[in-house]
Amino acid sequence: MSSGDQNRGGVADKALQLVLEMKRNPDVLPPYNTELVRQCYQKIDELFQKNAAVVEKIRAGLPHDSTLLQPRLAAMCHIRRCMMAYVNERKNRIRSFRWKYGGALPASVRNALCDAEIQFFNEYSSTLARFQSNLGEGGVNLLLHSAPPKSLFVQVRALEDYGEFETSDGTQVQLSKDSLHSLPRQDCEMLIRQGVLELVH
């Protein structure tokens, strides 16, 4: 057995690390693991080429060793499933960021994305914006109401020194850490999701 085949399980175990990486970080998005993804792609291609070479020998009636065809195929499927789970979980979290942060991602989140993920976020944002603009005569902002409102105004506390904030009626409000305010629910919904404000019960 070649050293490459002996190492088959090693890369399969690394592929599982992609899934565990997301499971261990449920509340944050880890940086895209470019190197590990590259190794997984490389190993799938390597195993595929080895199996293809064996199949060619079988078709040509040449001596061959087919004992590793199925193990290699199983390893390829395992690596692929892990990679798909990794990409799908990241995609779901990136979509949730659009609802949490709006169209502008914090630097800490953007820096964790690869170029393709940034492109996906931008395209998802554009699609959502087009959909909202086509609802009703003036469009509807679906990001404003994550739950049915109980009142038009809510009591909120600022969790950081945010600075000046303008409500929809033009009122200027200074949001300083621990300051209390009564604000229109629709105006502060996004800031609540971003962690700038919290509801005071």
Curated annotation (Swiss-Prot):
It is found in: Nucleus. Transmembrane segments: none annotated. InterPro entries: GINS_A (IPR021151), GINS_bundle-like_dom_sf (IPR036224), GINS_Psf1 (IPR005339), PSF1_C (IPR056783). The keyword Nucleus applies. GO terms for cellular component: GINS complex. GO terms for biological process: DNA strand elongation involved in mitotic DNA replication. CDD domains: GINS_A_psf1, GINS_B_Psf1. Keywords: DNA replication, Nucleus. Required for correct functioning of the GINS complex, a complex that plays an essential role in the initiation of DNA replication, and progression of DNA replication forks. GINS complex is a core component of CDC45-MCM-GINS (CMG) helicase, the molecular machine that unwinds template DNA during replication, and around which the replisome is built. Belongs to the GINS1/PSF1 family. Component of the GINS complex which is a heterotetramer of gins1, gins2, gins3 and gins4. This is Probable DNA replication complex GINS protein PSF1. It comes from Caenorhabditis elegans.
